[in-house]
Amino acid sequence: MTTSPGVPEPSAQLLRLAAEVRQAAMALGQSDDNQRRKALMAMANALLSSSEQIVRANQLDLEKARTEGLASALMARLRLDESKLNSAIEGLRQLAQLTDPLGLRQLHRELDQDLVLERITVPLGVLGVIFEARPDAVIQITSLAIRSGNGALLKGGSEASHTNQAIIEALKNGLAETEIDPEAIALLKTRQESLALLRLDGLVDLIIPRGSNELVRFIQDNTRIPVLGHADGICHLYLDAAADLKQALQIAIDSKTQYPAACNSIETLLIHQSIAPSFLELAIPAFLQAGVRLLGDSASRALGVEESASEEDWATEYLDLILSVKVVPDLEGALDHIRRYSSRHTEAIVSNDQETAERFLQAVDSAGVFHNCSTRFADGFRYGFGAEVGISTQTLPPRGPVGLEGLVTYRYRLRGQGHIVADYANGECMFTHRDLPL
């Protein structure tokens, strides 16, 4: 996409900052595994030492957000208490222990004697990350960037300005004690800078938006830089005729209420008509007790769901304690609904019929398709990636939770001894194309 007239040209100051990040990123990309491991551990220690200041800064942001009437879903994302911060720090430490994503040989092939081709993983370069009320995203993204040898330009929402600044200062202080240049990461502070970031093709290699549907769509429509992300998280849970009702209820409650503001929480519950009466008899009181507002189709309303779901509801990412409920005739009815309304993020089935479950797993074209477990498992940390920069719902890779592997590209290296193409064109030499051990 070409940028729109509403996206400003980058200022001289922003161009200078981006160039500094890129220069530092070039050195970072040539650092070794041990240097980057030590950098992450130093970042974790700095966050721990600054935890009181970070939580205090977050309280300032929360108080301001309350007075401005910030939506409850955004308030939940904005909150960074000691427990949430400690979890992020632990994720950073785990990330330091993961296998180095750089320098991995993916292909090793002899083209001819003494003419050997390799494909090696290398950093992308500089990440441009734009996110809304998610201060923990600063920790996740900067740690993933450093571990994968990438620089990062970050712009958080103004509602988290105090928290973001406190976090980035701690992270830079940690890096200053290592061989990694703290200039590899930078925090943008104004909306004008975040818009102008979209014009930094040549200095930024990938844009990663984390926020509302509107934010992601705007970025996708207004930059020439590749964009990684998803615009919606409309996730579905289908309860099959062969579902264990107790298990189904536990999974449904967890998928909706464990963290309703997350993009991997369910927005629609699909129930096979044969179990709908017995399941809803159990589920409606449980959901109401958990504070969930239920919206249903005519069949589910006849079974006790009080409010009607509109056509718009099936296509809505609530990010709140609201759940649309629909009774379907069979698996095909569930699949039809998912094909029509899914954002291709994560869908799940509860069933003790293996054949039905396999059919669901094969037929649903989403980044994550689960059987007998909560959709909330769609997360880089829970997948063992250490952390994630976001979840991609695009078909081309990377797809799903994007961790270290999604932040590297590859380079072909060819080593020869004076080889020239003319010798192969005239038939004097022949290719061997022999694969060698990786």
Curated annotation (Swiss-Prot):
Its main location: cytoplasm. The keyword Nuclease does not apply. SUPFAM superfamilies: ALDH-like. It is an enzyme of class 1 (oxidoreductase). Pathway: Amino-acid biosynthesis; L-proline biosynthesis; L-glutamate 5-semialdehyde from L-glutamate: step 2/2. It holds the Pfam family Aldedh. InterPro entries: Ald_DH/histidinol_DH, Ald_DH_C, Ald_DH_N, Aldehyde_DH_dom, G-glutamylP_reductase_CS, Glu-5-SA_DH, GPR_dom. GO terms for molecular function: glutamate-5-semialdehyde dehydrogenase activity; NADP binding. Keywords: Amino-acid biosynthesis, Cytoplasm, NADP, Oxidoreductase, Proline biosynthesis. Disulfide bonds: none annotated. Its EC number is 1.2.1.41. The keyword Translocase does not apply. GO terms for biological process: L-proline biosynthetic process. It is found in: Cytoplasm. Catalyzes the NADPH-dependent reduction of L-glutamate 5-phosphate into L-glutamate 5-semialdehyde and phosphate. The product spontaneously undergoes cyclization to form 1-pyrroline-5-carboxylate. PANTHER family: DELTA-1-PYRROLINE-5-CARBOXYLATE SYNTHASE (PTHR11063:SF8), GLUTAMATE SEMIALDEHYDE DEHYDROGENASE (PTHR11063). This is Gamma-glutamyl phosphate reductase. It comes from Prochlorococcus marinus (strain MIT 9313).
